[in-house]
């Protein structure tokens, strides 16, 4: 497997030789994990195009893949696979998404069992450009703060809620607030469209800490008055998109991008709605749902 850092980018690497289909031994899996922990975003190229079943199996090597919980927008036979597209055929929307800008977020932050790794594969891309996916390093935001600022942020909790425009397609029994706590072992991977998490997350593999917020799904800091919450969140979220912390991925058909969901936020650039953009996505979650939230003093 060949891993090449993306020239001039603060994060991200291109990977050739990853085994996306077929068997994968423990050593090869650990090589991918190591590259992911180092570069946060991996662009896999030059591999055999996986079937839907193989795509799902590849994602499962990195943790449990929950169902999307969508009544429409997911693959009809594999609800775990989200179809992301701007297509409408015979008056029927294909998948979820559109050609507009999609704001900064990390997938499933509104669930008590949050995402660990994202997998997004390009099936069709706009031929005249646009539709890039942007990734911002939120570990770098935490590490840029003073010790006093870090200690303060460790004391806060944040409410996340699903606010993406397709809430009505979520199965009704999942539309509720669920928070880790007593009886956490009974929480199902797909539970919840609203939850409360600590503001600071910790990667259980590397120990790095990130500021776990987004513009799309973060409602407020529950420990602050609304105006104070908004002021602090706006200040922190101004980090998203800064060039020194952000990689903009221009898609090629067949690209499979794998990224650290705990330590980054991502967004989508707008593109010409007359052109086609079709992707498929799965997300792995942490086996230990409390893993990212172990209480620790700020470094």
UniProtKB/Swiss-Prot annotation:
InterPro entries referenced in this protein's UniProt entry, alphabetically: PentlctneF_syn, TauD-like_sf, TauD/TfdA-like, TfdA_dioxygenase
Single Gene Ontology BP annotation: pentalenolactone biosynthetic process
Cofactor(s) the protein needs: Fe(2+)
Binding annotation for Fe cation: 105, 107, 266
Gene3D superfamilies per the UniProt record, alphabetical: Clavaminate synthase-like (3.60.130.10)
Pathway terms, separated by semicolons: Antibiotic biosynthesis; pentalenolactone biosynthesis
Record text on cofactor binding: Binds 1 Fe(2+) ion per subunit.
Record key words, sorted: Antibiotic biosynthesis, Dioxygenase, Iron, Metal-binding, Oxidoreductase, Vitamin C
Transcription found in the keyword field: no
Control of this protein's activity: Activated by ascorbate.
UniProt catalytic activity: pentalenolactone D + 2 2-oxoglutarate + 2 O2 = pentalenolactone F + 2 succinate + 2 CO2 + H2O
A Pfam entry, by short name: TauD
Sequence positions that bind 2-oxoglutarate: 133, 251, 277
Consequences of knocking out this gene: Accumulation of pentalenolactone D and lack of production of pentalenolactone as well as the precursors pentalenolactones E and F.
Molecular-function GO terms, alphabetical: dioxygenase activity; L-ascorbic acid binding; metal ion binding
Assigned EC number: 1.14.11.36
Metal-binding recorded as keyword: yes
Protein family membership: Belongs to the TfdA dioxygenase family.
NCBIfam families: Neo-PentlctneFsynPtlD (NF045815)
Function: Catalyzes the Fe(2+) and alpha-ketoglutarate-dependent oxidation of pentalenolactone D to pentalenolactone F in the biosynthesis of pentalenolactone antibiotic. Also able to catalyze the oxidation of pentalenolactone D to pentalenolactone E.
PANTHER family, alphabetized: (3R)-3-[(CARBOXYMETHYL)AMINO]FATTY ACID OXYGENASE_DECARBOXYLASE, DIOXYGENASE RV0097-RELATED
Protein name: Pentalenolactone F synthase
Gene name, Swiss-Prot/TrEMBL: pntD
């Amino acid at each position: 497997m060949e891993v090449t850092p993306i020239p001039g980018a603060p994060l991200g690497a291109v990977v050739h030789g990853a085994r996306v289909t077929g068997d994968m031994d423990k050593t090869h899996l650990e090589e991918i994990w190591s590259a992911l922990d180092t570069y946060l975003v991996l662009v896999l190229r030059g591999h055999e195009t996986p079937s839907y079943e193989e795509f799902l199996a590849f994602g499962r090597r990195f943790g449990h893949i929950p169902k999307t919980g969508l009544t429409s927008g997911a693959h009809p036979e594999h609800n775990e696979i989200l179809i992301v597209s701007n297509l409408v055929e015979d008056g029927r929307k294909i998948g979820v998404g559109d050609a507009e800008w999609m704001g900064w977020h990390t997938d499933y932050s509104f669930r008590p069992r949050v995402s660990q790794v994202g997998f997004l594969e390009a099936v069709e891309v706009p031929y005249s450009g646009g539709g890039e996916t942007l990734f911002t390093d939120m570990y770098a935001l935490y590490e840029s703060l003073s010790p006093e600022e870090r200690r303060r942020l460790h004391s806060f909790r944040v409410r996340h809620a699903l606010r993406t425009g397709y809430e009505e397609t979520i199965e009704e029994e999942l539309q509720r607030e669920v928070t880790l706590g007593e009886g956490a072992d009974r929480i199902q991977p797909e539970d919840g469209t609203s939850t409360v998490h600590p503001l600071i997350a910790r990667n259980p593999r590397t120990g790095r800490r990130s500021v776990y917020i987004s513009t799309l799904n973060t409602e407020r800091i529950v420990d602050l008055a609304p105006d104070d919450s908004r002021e602090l969140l706006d200040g922190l979220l101004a980090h998203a998109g800064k060039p020194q912390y952000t990689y903009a991925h221009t898609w090629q058909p067949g690209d499979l991008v794998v990224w650290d969901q705990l330590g980054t936020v991502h967004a989508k650039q707008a593109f010409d709605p007359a052109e086609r953009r079709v992707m498929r996505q799965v997300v792995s979650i942490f086996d230990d749902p409390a893993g990212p939230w172990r209480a620790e003093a700020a470094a």
